[in-house]
Amino acid sequence: MPRSARFRPFLATAASGALVLAALAGAGPASASSAVPATLPARAHGLGDLIYQQKPLRVATYNLSLNRGAAGQLVTDLSTPDDEQAKTVAEVIQRAAPDIVLLNEFDYVEAGVAVDLFRQNYLQVSQNGAPAVSYPYAFVAPSNTGIPSGYDLNNDGTVGGGDDAFGFGLFPGQYGMVVLSRHPIQTENVRTFQNFLWRDMPGALLPDDPATAAPNDWFTPEELAVVRLSSKSHWDVPVTVGPHTVHVLASHPTPPTFDGPEDRNGRRNHDEIRFWADYISSPRSGYIVDDAGQKGGLTLKDSFVILGDQNADPRDGDSVDTAIDQLLENWRIQDPLPTSSGAVEASAVQGGANATHQGDPKYDTADFADTAPGNLRADYVLPSRALRVTDAGVFWPEQADPLFRLTGVFPFPSSDHRLVWVDVRVPRFRL
């Protein structure tokens, strides 16, 4: 089915000024007859130019696979400017030049040591003639990956190892994440949800042991008292853009695979995605409590962008059927549908599972195994409707492009994921 149906823009033309103002205040969706595409031609927009800041804000997400197999190895690799993978992913970021970017699979190191080294030795140094980029603001926090739970969460009869951690990882912080920004981060207002328990989500899709008649009993009551929802964490990182605040909602749900018939990872992936759908939807957010004890989610007046490798494709792959639809079909969210010609070419050349996919390959963001699951749309930049989308794309060059060397084919010089970016115009005033 055509993907364009998912993009249900809310902002009306400049002539409908009252409707635009209502949208920014968090009113309900416009009727189909009054809505127009959020990506508009480059021209004067009258009232729209009075409402929105002139310069677009480029927001991106990038699973750069800058994880290592042992604690401390990433710091060692980034301590010099010579790590080839780090140079390559840094050049990808320099070529895309986002103002705000979420980096997934960047090992957490206390005090932000690895982040500082990556900025100093790679991003702030021109790679192959690409303009260096500077991100004076960064947010990094612990991840659930690799933290021992003390329980046999995968029910294999032993306690310990990555599968029994709160999030899969060989050491604490493996596969962590980072937010980098050219605009000030309101550090004092950041909210994290690392410790939120899965059982505390109403109607959670808790996994079921197929060997018993009882429902949702994969975990024991003792395990449910400690099992966390986030496989890494969920972050609400407010960023100041002019007089306006944009909430960067960052996460990296677990892959919906590497389990059994209980589908514990598929169900967790679904609920990790659902968390943001509830967080932006008052009063559904009432059950949410952050790590500091503050309850609730965003208000209807708050602007936001949901970022991250969600590990869920709307048409293909192994995720629960409606997992990513919880965001793509949420009335507060725009789906800019970023595309690339490189993804189309890769699908055709690689074949395999790609040949049987239902989704259009131009939306793919990850180059996975050709046998299964094939290439998928896994990475998302989803702005709220109070932001005006002007452009979007996926950094996936075709093979004939000189920049194809940055993405390549397996074994990848950078990552099996591609950087996804969206340009938005932010309101000029506080709501």
State each model region's role.
Residues 1-17:
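N-terminal export and membrane-targeting signals
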Residues 38-42, 184-191, 196, 200, ...:
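Metal-dependent phosphoester-hydrolase catalytic domains
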Residues 64, 105-106, 183, 253, ...:
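Active-site metal-binding loops of divalent metal-dependent hydrolases
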Residues 176, 249-251, 307:
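Generic beta-strand/beta-sheet core signal
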Residues 244-268:
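Active-site His/acidic residue clusters
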Residues 231-233:
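Residues that define the transmembrane beta-barrel architecture of outer-membrane proteins
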Residues 8-12, 24-179, 206-228, 237, ...:
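N-terminal, active-site-proximal structural segment of metallo-dependent hydrolase catalytic domains
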Residues 63, 139-142, 184, 194, ...:
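Residues at the C-termini of beta-strands that transition into short coil/loop
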